[in-house]
Regions:
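A conserved acidic beta->alpha catalytic loop
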Residues: 31, 48-58
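Glycine-rich, basic loop-to-helix element that forms the pyrophosphate-binding segment
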Residues: 78-97
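A recurrent flexible, glycine/aromatic-enriched loop bordering the glycosyltransferase active site
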Residues: 167-201
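Conserved donor NDP-sugar-binding/catalytic core segment of glycosyltransferases
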Residues: 113-151
Length: 327
């Protein structure tokens, strides 16, 4: 991040959603700012805090005061707009308004680490070389070096009917990767949807799609819906081969994850209805049967496994709500 550049010289803004994961946030901010300090382009950071109560907001304010050259802006959520999608949309709108010459929006989460500036430089070069690409993500790994998923193919009704575990066993979620290509020393390929951890987005594509659909996809599947809408407009998604990008929550689940299984089913149903058609309603009897089988299995398991009791309650909830689109 070049401190000599004023706001008019900022070309890239990193957007971070923060909610009650201070230890991860500290690591994410530290590695990001360290990488950006060596960048040849002007940059800034906008953090949306969704109501953290673990000291995250206080850490951010102290960091901003102690590091003014890092161009760190903080947005505190209002009570009625605290979802993940709201946070990204609000922060991106603020970034564009605050830095009018911004060309790139870098969606970066608290469980990300950027080890150096090279991945970002490659992503910018690739998007400049390939004008049909809306965004570029990276092959990512955990802190221990193990591979972590970076994207997936657009989901089918079959994969939804089978459930996440069985669909994964059948390889129905694997990215539909193209062959690897090389452009200006950058090894990359495409797939349907690239996750937002992290993701460099072309401003033009973001504005054309009007960002995330926060009303229908406040949390899960918002990135899939956005990628699908991009594809319908002719945009593509790229993955860049990299060894320098981390995606690892270190087993610290966000408070946003508390109702994940129900949210997943509700949003996946909406996603498939929007992009695959109204025939998704024909799956309801199949989904009801699946939830019934899951309920029976969890009921037996809950006798010896206390953790299964909460899962059982969620399955019972889905049994009741599947007929009303999980609402």
């Amino acid at each position: 991040m070049n401190p000599s550049l004023d706001q008019s010289g900022v070309e890239l803004v990193a957007v971070i959603n923060s909610f009650n994961r201070r230890s991860l946030l500290e690591r994410a901010i530290t590695t990001l700012t360290s990488a950006l300090q060596s960048a040849q382009f002007g940059s800034a950071i906008v953090v949306f805090d969704a109501g953290s109560e673990d000291g995250s907001l206080e850490f951010l304010k102290a960091w901003r005061e102690n590091n003014p050259a890092h161009n760190l802006a903080i947005i505190e959520a209002t009570s009625d707009r605290r979802s993940f999608s709201d946070g990204v949309n609000i922060a991106c709108a603020d970034a564009i308004a605050r830095f009018p010459k911004t060309r790139w929006l870098f969606l970066y989460e608290t469980d990300n680490c950027l080890l150096n500036i090279e991945p970002l430089e490659k992503a910018i070069r690739l998007l400049n070389l390939e004008p049909q690409l809306a965004a570029a993500g990276f092959t990512v790994k955990k802190h221990d070096g193990t591979f972590f998923g970076y994207g997936m193919r657009f989901p089918s009704m079959l994969s939804f009917a089978l459930g996440q575990n069985l669909a994964a066993l059948c390889n129905l979620h694997s990215p539909n990767n193209s062959a690897w290509r090389n452009s200006d020393g950058i090894r990359w390929r495409t797939c349907d949807a690239v996750f937002t951890s992290p993701l460099l987005i072309r401003r033009q594509a973001w504005e054309q799609t009007t960002g995330f659909d926060a009303e229908n996809f406040p949390f899960s599947d918002t990135d899939l819906d956005w990628a699908w809408r991009c594809a319908r407009l002719g945009w593509g998604m790229a993955i860049i081969a990299s060894e320098d990008v981390i995606h690892d929550n270190l087993e610290q689940l966000s408070a946003w994850s508390a109702n994940r299984v129900v949210d997943f089913h509700r949003n996946r149903f909406r996603l498939l209805k929007r992009h695959r058609g109204k025939q998704i309603a024909l799956l309801k009897p199949v989904l009801f049967l699946r939830h019934g089988l899951e309920t029976l299995i969890l009921k037996r398991r809950s006798r010896v496994d206390p953790a299964a009791k909460e899962k059982l309650a969620k399955r019972k909830q889905m049994l009741r709500t599947v007929w009303s689109n999980y609402s």
